Amino acid sequence: MAFIECRDVCKNFGEKVALDHVSLDIPKGQIFGLLGPNGAGKTTMIRIINRITIPNSGEVLFDGRPITQKDVEKIGYLPEERGLYRKMEVGDQAMYLAQLKGMSEKDARAELKKWFMKFGIQDWWKKKVEELSKGMAQKVQFITTVVHKPSLMILDEPFSGFDPVNAELIRKEILELKEQGATVILSTHNMESVEELCDNIALINKSHLVITGGVEDIRRRYGNNNVELVYTGETPLEAVPGLFSIISDTNDAGRHTAVLSLAGQGLGNNVLTEVLKQNVVVNSFKELLPRMNDIFIKLVTETA
C-alpha cells in the first residue's frame, strides 16, 4: 500500500512550470529515491509533500487521506540547504526543533541525549553552532530530523559534505530507521547510494515524470543481455555453440573472467548448460545489469 500518494500534481511559478501532472506512489516502510537533474522539479515536489508549497492542482494523500498540517509533524525533513541558527548553542537549537515537532521538553531532552551519545557528540551540547564544521553541523541536523521518530523522512542529499566514515554512519542509521518501519524519501545525485539503499525510485526531468518502479526491475528493463562468467580450465569459449559473443575474456593464472553478450533474452541457462559440458569448472555466472548512473544519463539525455 502506498503511504504517500501524489496525484496529478501541477505547480507553476509564474510562467515556469515546475511540475506537470506528476503522480507518485511511495510505499510504506521502504526507501524511495526521488531522482532528477538540477532544476527538474524534485525540490518542488518535496516542498509540496511537506506543505511548504501548495500545488496549483492535484493532491497529496498521507496514509490514504489528504495530507494536513498535523501530518507534517510526523515528517522529518532534512533539506539540501542546511539551516541551523549559527549563534545558538547546539543543545538549545536541537531542543527547539524537537519541540516544534510536538515533543515535550522532557521527551525531547531524553531522546536528544540518546542520539548525541550514539553519535559520540555529547560534548557538543553547549557549543555554538558556528563553532562546528560543516560535517559536524550536518550530524546535528540529521539528529533533529529523526529525533521525533517520524513516520516519513525526507532526506535531500543527506551524504553531502560527509567524509566516508560519517557517510557510512548516516547510511547505517537510514537503514536502521527503515527496519524500524519508517518510510524514507531519498533525493540524491549519488547513484551508488540509490542502488545500495533504494527499493523504488522515480525520475523527474523537465517537470515531468520520466520513469518510476523498483530499482532492480528498472535495471533489468534496461539490461543488454550481458553476463559475467568466471571459470577455470583451458577449453576456449569459442568451442561452445553460438549462443553468445565474447566481449572480453581475461586469464589470471588459469582463472578466466569473461563478459558475454547473449544472443537473446532468456538464454542464460542454455549458455551455462553448454559451458558445463566443456572441460571447465564454473566458479560464478551472473547477469550484468546496467548501473543506475548509466540509466540516469540515458533517460535524462533522451528527455532533454
Model feature map: region roles:
Residues 172-261:
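ABC transporter nucleotide-binding domain
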Residues 13, 101-102, 119, 222, ...:
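A broad structural signal for alpha-helix termini and local helix breaks/kinks
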Residues 2-6, 11-205, 211:
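ABC transporter nucleotide-binding domains
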Residues 226-299, 304:
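Short, charged/small-residue-rich alpha-helical element at the C-terminal edge
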